[in-house]
Swiss-Prot record:
Flavoprotein recorded as keyword: yes
Keyword DNA repair applies: no
Upper lineage: Bacteria, Pseudomonadati, Pseudomonadota, Alphaproteobacteria, Rhodobacterales
Protein residues bound to FMN: S10, S16, V17, S18
Coiled coil regions, renumbered to chain: none
GO MF annotation list: electron transfer activity; FMN binding; oxidoreductase activity, acting on NAD(P)H as acceptor; oxidoreductase activity, acting on NAD(P)H, quinone or similar compound as acceptor
Pfam families: Flavodoxin_2
SUPFAM superfamilies, per the entry: Flavoproteins
EC identifiers of the protein: 1.6.5.-, 1.7.1.17
Gene3D superfamilies the record matches: 3.40.50.360
Record's protein name: FMN-dependent NADH:quinone oxidoreductase 1
Organism: Jannaschia sp. (strain CCS1)
Cofactor(s) in the UniProt record: FMN
Gene name for this UniProt entry: azoR1
């Protein structure tokens, strides 16, 4: 059975287009679903986290292990998933702070990627990501969209190169067209 990790980054629980899109995508794909709602506190990295992360695992104190416990859980969720479905609202041309905090918690050298003589290598190969993008005025893929390229790069960096974007962009300009485009892209996922 397919295991899906659904990640919702919108600060809005009600009326969120990206959450609506992730719901539709997950319903279409079916399978076992783990939901990670990033409106619950995902802490930003701090000095204690950095120190714990760069201490070899077998040398970490109990406090350092506790410091990394949420990060370990988040990484395990990604490792267990076959498909990630990520809700990506574009806030001020970029990703929400909560999504950036999640990325910081899961992008760990020696855990989800490693450095080699030829450069970094992602360790999460063989997974798929579907990123549901919603924006009020920013056109996905445009020169002022710093979110979709960032997500494609980060996912590729950790080894997830099969990335599909479902976009409902420019919702404040033409909501009907935005929803229609997203629906067409969602239907294509079933093909």
């Amino acid at each position: 059975m397919t295991h899906i990790l659904r990640i919702d980054a919108s600060a809005r629980r009600d009326g969120s287009v990206s959450r609506d899109l992730t719901t539709q995508i997950v319903d279409l794909l079916g399978g076992e679903v783990t939901i990670r709602d990033l409106t619950t506190a995902i802490p930003q990295l701090d000095e204690a986290w950095i120190g714990a992360n760069f201490t070899p695992a077998d040398q970490r104190t109990a406090q350092q292990q506790e410091t990394l416990s949420l990060s370990d859980t988040l990484v395990a969720e990604v490792q267990a998933a076959d498909t990630l479905v990520i809700g990506l609202p574009i806030y001020n041309f970029g990703v929400p702070a909560a999504l950036k905090a999640w990325v910081d918690q899961i992008a760990r050298a020696g855990v989800t990627f490693q450095y080699t003589e030829t450069g970094p290598k992602g360790l999460l190969e063989g997974k798929r990501a579907i990123v549901a993008v919603a924006s009020g005025g920013t056109e996905a893929g445009s020169d002022i969209d710093f979110a979709t390229g960032y997500m494609r790069h980060v996912l590729g960096f950790i080894g997830i190169t099969d990335v599909t974007f479902v976009t409902a962009d420019r919702l404040m300009v033409d909501p009907d067209a935005a929803h229609k485009t997203a629906q067409t892209q969602i239907e294509a996922l079933a093909a």
